[in-house]
A protein has these predicted regions:
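Interhelical loop/hinge segments that connect adjacent transmembrane helices in multipass membrane
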Residues: 1-6, 182, 197-239, 243, ...
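N-terminal membrane topogenesis motif
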Residues: 1-24, 78-85, 122, 151, ...
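Transmembrane helical elements of multi-pass membrane transporters/channels
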Residues: 8-25, 163, 184-199, 203, ...
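Helix-terminus/linker motif at the lipid-water interface of multi-pass membrane proteins
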Residues: 22-40, 111-114, 175-177, 236-269, ...
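Helix-loop junctions and terminal segments of transmembrane helices
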Residues: 29, 58-74, 148-149, 207, ...
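Interfacial/gating helices of multi-pass transporter permease domains
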Residues: 31-55, 83, 122, 181-184, ...
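Hydrophobic transmembrane helix module of multi-pass membrane transport proteins
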Residues: 91-240, 380, 452
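Membrane-proximal transmembrane or re-entrant/amphipathic helices at the cytosolic face
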Residues: 427, 451-504
Length: 504
């Protein structure tokens, strides 16, 4: 049952990420050509600042998912209701705080970009972009955490996938007929809000005994402060770059943020793709840990890590070779700022590697609820990021900021590998490091050869796509073969596990 639910979640999440990836690649290009790099940079920057304000969520969602694992597994309906009631109260408080912080941002943000765009456009854009988060706090959040904890995240994923398609089609149509950027984003926010109705209908039918107004058990969310700390760190680490660029680069800040946003569009697409292979598994691992099935955990984790690393290094090999040609084609008609920068291509590829190599271990840490135990490591990650970024931005610009991100991700990712080995999946670090090193060596060779074989200046998406297919097939062949030769038993076990899940 766990395997089948995990497969459903993984497939639905993968579908969502593919759709989000396509939308994330297509829409910004229309926005760039219709409204220019400064507007695109402003939208990117505002979204990052709103992510900071998302700290108002205070770790409630993460803590709720962890708290629900055991009562859902043991079918303790009253306990589930009391936890969800407490979650509803916390989400309502978070929504009010987020609204207040948004109003503050509306007042101060225009001063950061003074003279680059009209203040009225910027202020209204902040309010429009904040709308979807407000809906999440006041209405959708409590349903989403329940479905995630009960291994039904695929429901939310499928509904969101449909909404993303509708949003993309409607937005492109509005841009095509000459609508203003503010109206386009307002309609997009409206489409996002509609998914609330579908999620609510599903939950009401599937869980008729739920009571979000039962006696709240706020003590069950004791992990929320520790989860909040990790959330704070995650937001700082993931959004420091845009914030530093916006504040420190003066009159050219929005143009540089636009360049950053195009590369991050690729990074986010890759990260979303990789996330689809872990999203559906956290709840399953949480159930295994809750039931103390140590041997099952060890075997399942090894298979998961093996599969994840194979996929991850295939993707990184392709990204390392193809990111610069892609950016060149994507921005071929834009002349207001230089987008193709080889150093950025290398640094963003390193960032993707450092971000994703931690995911298998992080999945287990989240499933076990080890937020308090890992808080100091998380704080150090944020300190490294901010310190190095601010120290290098004045001399090296965007490259200096990215070096700060590489350093912080590098420290934290490998610390997670060893923490998982010490406390959760005993003794797994040696195997993990061996897998990482052999795949890094393989990918380094693939990237070196690939950059000589594939032209780094391409003028059409068709040509780029054909080269991408060739690079993809080559990477799949070499990475899969090398991992099969080195660990044939793990390969066969993974294949049998997938076959068993599909047959069920």
């Amino acid at each position: 049952m766990r395997g089948k639910q995990a497969l459903k979640n993984m497939v639905a999440s993968l579908l969502l990420q593919v759709i989000v990836l396509l939308s994330g690649l297509i829409l910004p290009r229309f926005i760039l050509e219709a409204y220019g790099s400064s507007v695109n940079g402003m939208i990117t920057s505002v979204n990052q600042f709103l992510t900071y304000l998302g700290l108002a969520e205070a770790g409630v969602g993460t803590a709720t998912v962890v708290a629900l694992y055991t009562p859902l597994a043991l079918k303790q309906t009253e306990e589930v209701n009391s936890i969800l009631s407490a979650t509803r109260k916390f989400y309502n408080k978070s929504g009010m705080l987020f609204l207040a912080l948004t109003l503050v941002l509306i007042g101060v943000y225009p001063f950061f970009i003074s003279g680059q765009l009209e203040n009225s456009l910027v202020r209204w854009m902040i309010l429009v972009l904040a709308g979807s988060t407000l809906v999440d706090y006041f209405f959708l959040g409590k349903y989403r955490v329940l479905l995630t904890a009960n291994q039904e995240g695929y429901v939310v994923a499928l509904i969101q996938a449909a909404g993303t398609i509708v949003n993309m089609v409607v937005s492109i149509f509005l841009i095509y007929i000459g609508a203003g950027v503010l109206f386009v984003k307002a309609v997009a926010t409206g489409v996002y809000m509609l998914r609330l109705v579908l999620v609510k209908i599903y939950v009401k039918r599937k869980y008729p005994v739920l009571d979000f107004y039962a006696e709240p058990n706020e003590g069950a969310l004791k992990q929320k402060n520790a989860a909040l700390l990790h959330q704070v760190v995650g937001i700082i680490v993931n959004n420091t770059d845009t914030t530093v660029l916006t504040i420190c680069l003066g009159a050219k800040s929005l143009l540089e943020v636009s360049v950053y946003g195009i590369y991050m569009m690729v990074v986010n697409a890759v990260n979303q793709l990789m996330t689809s292979f872990s999203n559906g598994l956290t709840a399953g691992f949480g159930e295994v840990i809750a039931k103390n099935e140590e041997e099952t955990l060890k075997k399942s984790y090894s298979s998961y890590e093996y599969m994840y690393f194979v996929i991850m290094f295939i993707v990184i090999a392709c990204m390392g070779v193809l990111i610069l040609p892609f950016v060149g084609v994507y921005t071929i008609n834009l002349t207001d700022v230089q987008y193709v920068r080889p150093v950025l291509g290398i640094l963003f590829t390193l960032i993707v590697f450092m971000q994703n190599v931690r995911i298998p271990g992080l999945t287990i840490i989240c499933a076990a609820g080890h937020y308090k135990e890992t808080r100091y490591q998380a704080i150090l990650e944020a300190v490294i990021n901010i310190t190095v970024s601010l120290g290098l931005v004045w001399k090296f610009g965007m490259a200096g900021v990215l070096l700060g991100t590489v350093c912080s991700y590098g420290y934290r990712s490998f610390e997670i590998v060893f923490y998982t080995s010490r406390h959760l999946v005993k003794g797994c670090a040696k195997k993990s490091m061996f897998r990482i090193l052999r795949n890094v060596f393989t990918v380094a060779i693939l990237c070196t050869v690939g950059t000589y074989v594939i032209p780094q200046e391409i003028t059409s998406f068709t040509t780029w796509f054909l080269y991408a297919i060739g690079m993809g097939l080559t990477s799949v062949f070499f990475v899969v073969v090398i991992n099969y030769v080195v660990e044939p038993d793990e390969f066969m076990q993974l294949r049998h596990r997938v076959n068993d899940i599909i047959k069920k």
